[in-house]
UniProtKB/Swiss-Prot annotation:
Intramembrane glycolipid transporter that operates in the biosynthetic pathway of dolichol-linked oligosaccharides, the glycan precursors employed in protein asparagine (N)-glycosylation. The sequential addition of sugars to dolichol pyrophosphate produces dolichol-linked oligosaccharides containing fourteen sugars, including two GlcNAcs, nine mannoses and three glucoses. Once assembled, the oligosaccharide is transferred from the lipid to nascent proteins by oligosaccharyltransferases. Its main location: endoplasmic reticulum. Pathway: Protein modification; protein glycosylation. It is found in: Endoplasmic reticulum membrane. GO terms for biological process: dolichol-linked oligosaccharide biosynthetic process; glycolipid translocation; protein N-linked glycosylation. The keyword Glycoprotein does not apply. The keyword Transmembrane applies. It comes from Kluyveromyces lactis (strain ATCC 8585 / CBS 2359 / DSM 70799 / NBRC 1267 / NRRL Y-1140 / WM37) (Yeast). The chain crosses the membrane at residues 11-31, 41-61, 97-117, 136-156, 172-192, 207-227, 300-320, 353-373, 394-414, 424-444, 450-470, 499-519, 525-545. Belongs to the RFT1 family. This is Man(5)GlcNAc(2)-PP-dolichol translocation protein RFT1. GO terms for cellular component: endoplasmic reticulum membrane. It is a multi-pass membrane protein.
Length: 556
């Protein structure tokens, strides 16, 4: 099989498996949350989103830098005699991955205790006094530790590009967690809590809802650990122990000293860790801001906004970003002009796809989203500003998605010094973001709309920085290529400009004659307009689509 097509096939399969896993798990999550939202108030969504932020922050700071650093781990197959396994990787490389998998737990244990204790002491007494709240906090902490225990298994499957196994286990974990959450809330409402103003206890309802959320997180973590453990021990039973789950010293066949961790990977981990800390604070900084500048009800509204507004981001863009990061890290680990051209082609095609999709989101999202979602949310949310704010959030999604692939590229190829420099830039962006939040939320009193505008400006700065890095990266490595060759691979901006102009005209006419959609007839008109625009895009990019389909068919 052609090397180029083999890489493309792995990338395409990775995107497919991750996307299917995300679609299944998030689809179940979306369905059950849609049913739950009628039982829960904005205040409950606010506190659960805060707990979700705590959990994701501890997990991110504990494991994300290790996940990225181990993609660059050096295989010992490059020198000396090899002790091969079926997948083409030697046992020493896999054992090194297992060893690195223990670092997240070592970081996460003290970090979780410190962060949760600190935030618990600052919580409103109303939430602390809720029934089962202390038990919920303990379950959240326990779920963090259990999920970190499964990290060594995850690193092995990530390195071997076993997307199917990872997506399958993650889908099971999310599905079981959502079902457990849903069963507890609905069972309590139907069987325990009374009906009517005299019998129904909103205070207990809020307590049990938070407890159900915590149980769901625990079920998710336990499912992941059980699945990965079963996979490991079943392989041990059928093929013998290829590597040990225990922390094991690695003894190379050369005269080098034995080690637990590869030194180059450790050094890269140290440099990337602080850069990722700033990235996470910028990415999740909106949650920190709303915790300090917004009411609990507004926090709940923003949580629901993130769930519904970024659904396409989590279903489509997140799998592409992850697969791209893994694909580039493995592809560019070997210095080759052919690999450089392939990576550039993939990045350009993805960028064009994102830009076209952004046109549809910007034109049809704001005017249709409120009408579609009003059937989903219950009466508790109809009186809030949710339906108005979702229109503004639609403009944020394209920036969020485009930044995702640009930063995925940066993380895959940047050197330690470039990552260190990026950390200082992220510090500057953090300051600008905080100032914009104060300006739009406090000074102009724009509330959640101000937060969304601040996020858009933040993402624009990050896109500009990574875009400049990508340009310099390829310009430096491909500077010996002829101008004609370089120009031939650049995106056809004129085609996109023509489509964007027609899309803008369609959007203007749609807004002038219809405006915000209020009935099924207007919704149907918008669907027809979107289909016409889609046909135009396919026609204009028919050569690119044919090329991609031909490459996929050949690789298969």
């Amino acid at each position: 099989m052609n090397v180029k097509n083999e890489h493309m096939n792995k990338f395409a399969n990775g995107v497919l498996f991750l996307m299917l896993g995300q679609t299944l798990s998030k689809g179940v999550n979306f369905l059950l949350n849609t049913l739950l939202v009628r039982y829960l108030s904005p205040r409950i969504f606010g506190i659960t989103s805060f707990l979700e932020f705590l959990l994701s922050t501890v997990l991110f700071f504990s494991r994300e830098s290790i996940r990225i650093s181990t993609l660059r781990i050096k295989s010992t197959t490059d020198s000396g005699k090899l002790e091969k396994v079926e997948d083409g990787e030697d046992t020493r490389t896999l054992q090194s991955l297992i060893n690195f998998g223990y670092i997240p737990f070592v970081i996460g244990l003290p970090l979780s205790i410190i962060l949760i204790s600190w935030q618990y002491s600052n919580l409103n007494s109303y939430f602390i006094d809720l029934p089962y709240f202390k038990a919920s906090i303990f379950l959240i902490w326990l779920s963090i530790l259990i999920e970190l225990v499964s990290e060594p298994f995850y690193l092995v499957h990530q390195y071997l590009l076993n997307h199917f196994i990872r997506s399958k286990y993650e889908s099971l974990g999310v599905t079981f967690a959502c079902v457990a959450n849903f069963i507890i809330v609905v069972w309590f409402e139907k069987m325990v809590n009374g009906v009517g103003l005299e019998l129904h206890d909103d205070y207990k309802q809020e307590g049990i809802a938070i407890f159900a959320f915590a149980v769901g997180k625990l079920v998710h973590a336990m499912t992941l650990l059980a699945c990965y453990s079963y996979n490991y021990y079943s392989e041990v039973y059928t093929t013998g122990e290829r590597y040990s789950y225990k922390l094991t010293k690695i003894r190379p066949e050369t005269r080098q000293e034995s080690y637990y961790f590869q030194n180059d990977t450790v050094q890269h981990f140290k440099k990337v860790y602080f850069q990722l800390c700033f990235k996470h604070l910028l990415t999740e900084g909106d949650k920190l801001i709303i915790n300090s500048l917004c009411t609990v009800e507004e926090q709940g509204i923003y949580s629901l906004l993130s769930n519904y507004g970024s659904l396409i981001t989590r279903l489509l863009f997140a799998p592409i970003e992850e697969a791209l990061r893994l694909f580039l890290a493995r592809l560019l680990s070997v210095s080759s002009k052919k690999n450089l051209w392939l990576s550039m082609k993939v990045l350009i095609d993805l960028t064009k796809f994102y830009l076209y999709l952004s046109l549809f989101i910007i034109i049809f999202g704001p005017i249709n989203s409120s009408y579609l979602l009003k059937f989903v949310i219950g009466s508790k949310w109809s009186s809030t500003s949710f339906l108005e704010t979702i229109r503004t959030y639609c403009f944020y999604i394209p920036f969020l998605s485009l930044n995702g692939i640009f930063e995925a590229f940066f993380q895959s190829v940047a050197s330690g010094d470039q990552i260190f420099k990026h950390s200082y830039v992220m510090m500057l962006f953090s300051g600008i973001f905080l100032f914009n939040c104060w300006l739009f939320i406090e000074y102009f009193d724009l509330s959640l709309e101000g937060l969304i505008v601040s996020n858009i400006l933040n993402m624009a700065l990050r896109i500009a920085y990574c875009g400049n890095f990508i340009h310099k990266f390829y310009h430096y490595l491909l500077k010996e290529s002829s101008t004609e060759t370089t120009q031939s691979i650049l995106p056809n901006i004129s085609t996109f400009k023509n489509v964007a102009l027609i899309a803008a005209i369609i959007g203007a006419l749609d807004w002038y004659f219809i405006g915000y959609v209020e009935n099924m007839r207007e919704l149907l008109i918008n669907v027809i307009l979107a289909l016409l625009l889609l046909i135009l895009v396919i026609y204009k990019e028919k050569s690119l689509i044919s090329e991609l389909l031909a490459a996929k068919t050949y690789a298969a």
